[in-house]
């Protein structure tokens, strides 16, 4: 083939190749329009569907916020009391969430941020009205002491609770000393973040046990909340978990508010006792660190304020109560009152404005000694702040103390939740608490129980409710905190069916030496 012929052949071959490579396949005009319309339709559908899905997710987020409580089976019946007049905002799960939000508890998982803010406020300059007796040198000394206890964090997470079995004596809130402290300093706590095995992050943030500086539990028990049963349980757990327990000496009258010297003497005595140990007494909250002494683990129990008043009214009108005091205290016991006093029912007492049943707002010393102030046991020893009855200021101070100082504040109204939280947050003392409780439930449920009681009318309950507004708010606050602690442990799920413990049948001989 000649050179020209070969070149012509190659050019034709290249033209064919280019024609094939850059070929254009014709489409009907209608097909192009359909494809464009389909693309636009798909884009619009995806946009609308995504927007609707986003709105639905936001709605579900709000509805599912309290899911940790619904997973626990906590409904309005668990949170509210018997009466119809209770706060509407916690009678539903969504209401519970809104209540927690309004009190700052739902964002309470940012406890480290809160504590950091409090630390800044508690410097000698910013907090001078609380620390006008402390120098900058002492502030640095206290910080060094707190830092020195950091290495105990994992051990301190395993501390806490009270003991013993004894009847509650009639008590008076009036202090038997002239001097009552006027300043009840807040405690500056170190912030720990170390988790131990079995703890999740949220539970750790709600656990104050790790801030304890000594292996000692202080149970400043509130009267008529079932503290005798808890002390009996502690007596049994002491044999299992290896700690000692004690309570104050019985007396005809209890001193709830003490002056500074008596507080110091009591603390010094308690800190010299062999450890680990627990101590219980009817006494208002004591701030150990204001005496430059190590902080213990604080625990307590609460009860519906209306039920407490009903319980107290009939407790001091039970003949066996005075016979028991006579047997224990002899000639120092209070004599049995008149028959008229013993037979006075609460409905009549409230209706006739008897001094025993008159609830004057902001009253500092009521005519008769009783236990109408549950907040006092958490507010502290500042008589001017904490003694006025149903005081909002006392209630707010009590809330703050519970949130920053107390490891656990439980209630027998939620037995399984309380025992579960105690076991998990203070295992050093409460390990096996549920087993011990259910094995001895018959005995524990009868400790100090008063069968001398009567039905109280709805009218009387309503009158009490109107006069105990801040006491009731504090009680509800403590229950919400307890539920949060439990929910944090369970990751929003049940531990078991209602967290009931299945205990195998046992012979009764354990009652003798358990």
Swiss-Prot record:
Enzyme Commission identifier(s): 2.8.2.-
GO cellular component: chromosome; Golgi apparatus; Golgi membrane; nucleus
One annotated GO biological process: dorsal/ventral axis specification
Biased composition regions of type Acidic residues, renumbered to the chain: 171-185
Induction description: Down-regulated by gurken (grk) and EGF receptor signaling, preventing its expression in dorsal follicle cells.
Entry's transmembrane regions: 31-50
Protein's membrane topology: Single-pass type II membrane protein
SUPFAM superfamilies: P-loop containing nucleoside triphosphate hydrolases
Keyword Transmembrane helix: yes
Basic and acidic residues bias (residue ranges): 112-121, 155-170
Lumenal side: 51-514
Biased composition (Basic residues): 127-140
Compartment(s) where it occurs, according to its Swiss-Prot or TrEMBL record: Golgi apparatus membrane
Region (Disordered): 112-185
Recorded phenotype for the gene knockout or disruption: RNAi-mediated knockdown in females targeting all isoforms, or a combination of isoforms A, H, J and I only, results in dorsalized offspring.
Keywords in alphabetical order: Developmental protein, Glycoprotein, Golgi apparatus, Membrane, Signal-anchor, Transferase, Transmembrane, Transmembrane helix
Residues carrying covalently attached carbohydrate according to the record: 207, 287, 416, 451, 467
Molecular function (Gene Ontology), one example: endopeptidase activator activity
Annotated family: Belongs to the sulfotransferase 3 family.
Protein name stated in the entry: Uronyl 2-sulfotransferase homolog pip
Species name: Drosophila melanogaster
């Amino acid at each position: 083939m000649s050179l020209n012929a070969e070149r012509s052949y190659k050019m034709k071959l290249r033209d064919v190749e280019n024609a094939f490579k850059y070929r254009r396949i014709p489409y009907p005009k209608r097909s192009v329009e359909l494809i464009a319309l389909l693309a636009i339709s798909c884009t619009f559908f995806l946009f609308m569907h995504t927007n609707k899905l986003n709105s639905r997710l936001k709605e579900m987020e709000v509805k599912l916020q309290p899911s940790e409580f619904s997973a626990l089976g906590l409904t309005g019946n668990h949170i509210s009391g018997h009466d119809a007049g209770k706060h509407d905002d916690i009678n539903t799960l969504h209401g519970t969430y809104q209540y927690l939000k309004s009190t700052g508890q739902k964002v309470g998982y940012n406890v480290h941020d809160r504590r950091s803010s409090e630390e800044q406020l508690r410097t000698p300059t910013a907090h001078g009205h609380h620390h006008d007796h402390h120098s900058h040198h002492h502030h640095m000394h206290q910080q060094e002491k707190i830092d020195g206890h950091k290495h105990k964090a994992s051990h301190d997470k395993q501390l806490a609770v009270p003991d013993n079995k004894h009847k509650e004596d009639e008590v008076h809130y009036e202090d038997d000393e002239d001097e009552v402290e006027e300043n009840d300093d807040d405690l500056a706590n170190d912030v720990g973040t170390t988790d131990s095995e079995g703890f999740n992050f949220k539970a750790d943030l709600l656990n104050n046990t790790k801030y304890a500086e000594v292996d000692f539990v202080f149970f400043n028990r509130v009267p008529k909340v079932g503290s005798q049963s808890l002390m009996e349980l502690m007596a049994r757990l002491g044999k299992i978990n290896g700690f000692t327990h004690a309570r104050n000496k019985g007396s005809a009258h209890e001193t709830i508010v003490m002056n500074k010297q008596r507080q110091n003497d009591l603390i010094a005595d308690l800190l010299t006792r062999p450890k680990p140990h627990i101590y219980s007494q009817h006494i208002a909250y004591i701030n150990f660190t204001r005496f430059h002494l190590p902080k213990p683990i604080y625990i307590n129990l609460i009860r519906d304020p209306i039920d407490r008043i009903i319980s107290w009214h009939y407790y001091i009108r039970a003949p066996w109560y005075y016979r028991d005091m006579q047997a224990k205290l002899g000639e120092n016991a209070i004599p049995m009152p008149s028959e008229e006093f013993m037979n006075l029912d609460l409905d009549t007492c409230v209706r006739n404005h008897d001094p025993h049943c008159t609830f004057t707002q902001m009253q500092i010393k009521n005519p008769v000694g009783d236990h109408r102030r549950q907040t006092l046991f958490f507010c502290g020893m500042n008589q001017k702040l904490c003694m006025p009855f149903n005081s909002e200021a006392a209630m707010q101070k009590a809330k703050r103390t519970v949130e920053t100082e107390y490891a656990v504040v439980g209630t027998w109204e939620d037995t399984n939740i309380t025992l579960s939280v105690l076991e998990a947050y203070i295992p050093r003392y409460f390990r096996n608490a549920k087993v011990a409780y259910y094995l001895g439930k018959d005995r524990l449920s009868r400790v100090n129980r008063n069968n001398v009681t009567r039905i109280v009318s709805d009218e009387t309950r309503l009158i009490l409710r109107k006069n105990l507004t801040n006491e009731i708010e504090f009680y509800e606050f403590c229950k919400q905190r307890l539920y949060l602690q439990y929910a944090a442990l369970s990751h929003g799920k049940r531990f078991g069916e209602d967290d009931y413990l299945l205990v195998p049948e046992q012979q009764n001989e354990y009652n003798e030496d358990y």
